[in-house]
């Protein structure tokens, strides 16, 4: 009786181990696995995957630009070029949303938007 009891315990232990290891891998994500990133997940991924880039746009809002403080020495073409740069930055942000939120993207694909 004791031998069959120990055999049953070992069998149950092995079964538990197999179940735990197979279900435990369901929730882990490989870095190359594409997944959808939306909202704050895009920001978190940007901070994690693009550490060499900083986005200071939010800090500069409300402050006068040093270029505008020069007393009108900029031509209209330079001012328009500056506006166009900001427009392209906004479009690049929409590109990351289009590519990684509405469709899934991997870390390697996301890093193409680091710039």
From Swiss-Prot:
Record carries keyword Hydrolase: no
GO cellular component: extracellular region
Propeptide section residues: 22-29, 53-94
One MF term in the entry's GO annotations: toxin activity
Primary site of residence: secreted
Subcellular localization: Secreted
GO biological process: glucose metabolic process
4-carboxyglutamate PTM positions: 48, 98, 109
Cystine connections: 38-101, 50-114, 100-105
First and last residue of the signal peptide: 1-21
InterPro entries: Insulin-like, Insulin-like_sf, Insulin_CS
Tissue: Expressed by the venom gland.
Keyword Secreted: yes
Top-rank lineage group of the source organism: Eukaryota
Residues with the Cysteine amide modification: 114
Entry keyword set: Amidation, Carbohydrate metabolism, Cleavage on pair of basic residues, Disulfide bond, Gamma-carboxyglutamic acid, Glucose metabolism, Hormone, Hydroxylation, Secreted, Signal, Toxin
Functional summary from the UniProt entry: This venom insulin facilitates prey capture by rapidly inducing hypoglycemic shock. It is one of the smallest known insulin found in nature and lacks the C-terminal segment of the B chain that, in human insulin, mediates engagement of the insulin receptor (INSR) and assembly of the hormone's hexameric storage form. Despite lacking this segment, it both binds and activates human insulin receptor (long isoform (HIR-B)) with a high potency (EC(50)=15.5 nM). In vivo, intraperitoneal injection of this peptide into zebrafish lowers blood glucose with a lower potency than human insulin.
Family listed: Belongs to the insulin family.
Assembly information from the UniProt record: Heterodimer of A and B chains; disulfide-linked.
The protein's name: Con-Ins T2
């Amino acid at each position: 009786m004791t031998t069959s009891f120990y055999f049953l315990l070992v069998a149950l232990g092995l079964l538990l181990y197999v179940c735990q290891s197979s279900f435990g891998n369901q929730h882990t994500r490989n870095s190359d696995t594409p997944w959808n990133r939306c909202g704050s997940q895009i920001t978190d991924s940007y901070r994690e995957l693009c550490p060499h880039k900083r986005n200071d746009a939010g800090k500069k809002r409300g402050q006068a630009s040093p270029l505008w403080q020069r007393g009108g020495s900029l031509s209209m073409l330079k001012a328009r070029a500056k506006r166009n740069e900001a427009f392209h930055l906004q479009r690049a942000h929409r590109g990351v949303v289009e590519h990684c939120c509405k469709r899934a993207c991997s870390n390697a694909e996301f890093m193409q938007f680091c710039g």
